[in-house]
A protein has these predicted regions:
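Compositionally biased accessory segments in Actinobacterial proteins
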Residues: 1-268
Length: 268
């Protein structure tokens, strides 16, 4: 992250100490707003109770629900997709210590049109030096040996995607995706997981482990606000572009001259 120019922000602001933490998979949970504000700006409905816990968001078409509850066991994120067309119902759980930047890789992808390219869950990991281990289960291990992604094939035909991280104190978090989870979403997760860029945490919120590297930085509150707002603004712009295109798009006429061409379109 580039150092912001001096004097940026309102006069008299007091800089606050933050830390850039790497690897990101050991950075701790982080600010839930990184996920929820993007969803809200993308047109998702906030169904959370007034107290704000648990967090509940529904997609605009009500086919996906995202929840976060730190008080249930084991606690964390639960994401459910209903069966639609050729897509089976699916379910994903991510522990409460999964860094929000990694959670957002998955949840942000839910707000965007699906790419026409065939997804490859392993590709982002391999591009960033994660090692593949072949065995009963295909496993890809992080360069520091503290995180992995696995396609777990159990007995009786049971299978699921499993990711986890650990420190010298034991397990840090895990994430599980049913095999019916859309592959482009799992790839979005592995892309965010393997991103080598550090993530920022305020003082007092860096996990107590010797397996992370930290860089101290001074940040103005206005800088933090501007970075957060840029993410929200991008979500609003993308949502506006999609809804604007949908509202101005000519309706299909099954009996008109474009009936055949319209049916041949590839959906993204």
């Amino acid at each position: 992250m580039k150092k912001a120019s001096a004097g940026w922000g309102q006069a008299g602001q007091q800089a606050e100490q933050h830390y850039l933490v790497e690897p990101r998979h050991l950075a701790g949970g982080g600010d839930l707003g990184h996920v929820t504000e993007f969803l809200r700006a993308s047109g998702w409905q906030d169904r959370s109770p007034r107290a704000g816990v648990p967090v509940i968001f529904d997609s605009p078409d009500r086919t996906v629900r995202i929840g976060y509850d730190p008080y249930t066991q084991p606690g964390g994120w639960t994401i459910r997709g209903t069966a639609t067309g050729q897509q089976d119902a699916w379910h994903a759980t991510l522990g409460k210590q999964v860094p929000v930047e990694i959670v957002a890789g998955f949840t942000d992808a839910l707000t965007r049109p699906r790419s026409a390219h065939a997804p490859n869950v392993w590709e982002p990991l391999q591009q960033h030096g994660w090692d593949t281990e072949q065995g009963q289960h295909v496993t890809v291990m992080s360069p520091d040996g503290n995180a992995f992604v696995q396609f777990h094939q159990g007995e009786r035909g049971q299978a699921y995607w499993w990711a986890a991280a650990q420190t010298e104190h034991g397990p840090a978090w895990n994430a599980v995706f049913t095999p019916t989870t859309p592959m482009h979403l799992v790839q979005a997760f592995t892309t965010a997981l393997s991103d080598p860029q550090p993530v920022m945490r305020p003082r007092g919120h860096v996990p107590p482990t010797l397996r992370v590297r930290t860089t101290s930085v001074s940040v103005l509150p206005s800088q933090l606000s501007a970075w957060q707002q840029a993410r929200v603004t991008a979500a609003r712009a993308a949502t506006w572009a999609r809804t604007s295109w949908a509202s101005t798009r000519p309706r299909k006429n099954p009996t008109g001259p474009y009936a055949t061409a319209g049916g041949a379109r590839t959906r993204r």
